[in-house]
């Protein structure tokens, strides 16, 4: 039986193939000084509902400090065109427990629990539902 971490990593690679995104090029872009400069300027929204920790899925992740109910707003992923910790450190999984929702007539985006999230669980979204638009990524990679 495949564990959740391996399943999330396998699904990530499958998704890159589906969207025709070159993983080497993507990693080069993500590791560039320009990206790290931008990524380093992440707005801490002061939300005490989660903690930033090392993730078995990828790098850093956000872990719940208190039980979160289905459809509860966890916080902003994007606020005034600035990414927050939720926008930067929420990892991908096909077995997701949260969603990003755009706020109508705004550039803001919130993170909402898709199902009940227990203390200690990592906040996960399915990137297929949100961020990957192959036209954008294929033309904007270094």
Question: Which residues does each PLM region occupy?
Answer:
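Conserved catalytic SET/PR domain of SAM-dependent protein methyltransferases, capturing the structural core
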Residues: 1-142
């Amino acid at each position: 039986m495949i564990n959740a971490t391996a399943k999330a990593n396998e699904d990530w690679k499958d998704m890159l193939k589906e969207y025709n995104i070159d993983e080497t090029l993507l990693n080069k872009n993500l590791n560039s000084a320009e990206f790290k400069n931008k990524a380093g300027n992440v707005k801490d929204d002061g939300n005490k509902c989660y903690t930033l920790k090392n993730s078995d899925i990828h790098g850093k992740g956000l872990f719940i400090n208190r039980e979160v109910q289905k459809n509860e707003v966890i916080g902003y992923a994007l606020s005034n065109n600035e990414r927050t910790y939720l926008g930067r450190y929420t990892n991908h999984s096909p077995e997701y427990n949260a969603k990003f929702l755009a706020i109508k007539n705004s550039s803001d985006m919130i993170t909402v629990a898709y199902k009940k999230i227990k203390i200690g669980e990592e906040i996960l979204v399915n990137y297929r539902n949100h961020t990957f638009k192959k036209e954008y990524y294929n033309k904007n990679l270094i």
